[in-house]
Amino acid sequence: MMTKNSIEFDPYIERKAFDETKQGVKGLVDAKITEVPRIFHHRQDILTNKKPSASVSDLEIPIIDFASVHADTASREAIVEKVKYAVENWGFFQVINHSIPLNVLEEIKDGVRRFHEEDPEVKKSFFSRDAGNKKFVYNSNFDLYSSSPSVNWRDSFSCYIAPDPPAPEEIPETCRDAMFEYSKHVLSFGGLLFELLSEALGLKSQTLESMDCVKTLLMICHYYPPCPQPDLTLGITKHSDNSFLTLLLQDNIGGLQILHQDSWVDVSPIHGALVVNIGDFLQLITNDKFVSVEHRVLANRQGPRISVASFFSSSMRPNSRVYGPMKELVSEENPPKYRDITIKEYSKIFFEKGLDGTSHLSNIRI
């Protein structure tokens, strides 16, 4: 039987009304709401398994110390083996002693917070859903109008840093210097990571870089306001990344979980560490040797939670480069598991479906 509430609830109309405020989730919190609006409600079967099961509650993703990566050949090879184990079995690992200065990490987190807590009228000047033509875009839920069943409890801004960096005036003053400085270090560290990943595949160090895996850097900076009813919603629903590789800087609030052996495992924050995870395109070109693992972020009464995700994603701009399983990694015994596809085509699938809780790789699996 249709109830009065179910008749009155129109998800599209409510999403549009929320979007037109241009104030995001923070605007709701600033209005001192005590109940989470219906568009943010997730299905109960998704929300009932938030805590890791007893069998995995003591598990943690691999933590790899990079202090000796440049010391000598033996030290580098030992780190490559640890990276190989992590990306083949977990798809995630945390890096300590990665050489990015702590003050640079703290300043980018502070810059992200400053922007999101800026005067609403200033933020509105950067609000857009035209990510294709603007270097810097602020909004809430990039997939708000996709087929995703629920809206997530977060606001974000995104910025394409490479290969064509934005002009300084395109970046808000509150986070401008921090973004340029942090991204400079991320690009350098990303280059090292792709060298180690190439070596973990038994290939030459520059193999992945030669495939343009390091060419494009997209930064997405999330702000998760405190939630009055965290048991009804999620910060980000289950998904995998449509990138080659993602570097994540998170604050001390926590909430990130990865799906490991059909159970959710907490990724506990480590001060000064970076979280690294394999994206869909690296799983594709390695023919499932490296795994792109689904993950999510819980909503929390504490907050705001700040995170900075840096995606090495080739170019989402129109280009003709085709990606498929690498010839060096396929054989009669291990045939290609995916069809060839362009970044543009895969991104179209990703943005049309949004974060709907299913793997986008399934659309191109042979």
From Swiss-Prot:
InterPro entries: DIOX_N, IPNS-like_FE2OG_OXY, IPNS-like_sf, Oxoglu/Fe-dep_dioxygenase_dom. Keywords: Iron, Metal-binding, Oxidoreductase. Its EC number is 1.14.-.-. One of its GO terms (molecular function) is metal ion binding. The keyword Metal-binding applies. Its cofactor is Fe(2+). GO terms for biological process: biosynthetic process. It is an enzyme of class 1 (oxidoreductase). Residues 215-314 form the Fe2OG dioxygenase domain. SUPFAM superfamilies: Clavaminate synthase-like (SSF51197). Fe cation binds at residues 239, 241, 295. Gene3D superfamilies: B-lactam Antibiotic, Isopenicillin N Synthase, Chain. Belongs to the iron/ascorbate-dependent oxidoreductase family. This is 1-aminocyclopropane-1-carboxylate oxidase homolog 12. The lineage of its organism: Eukaryota, Viridiplantae, Streptophyta, Embryophyta, Tracheophyta.
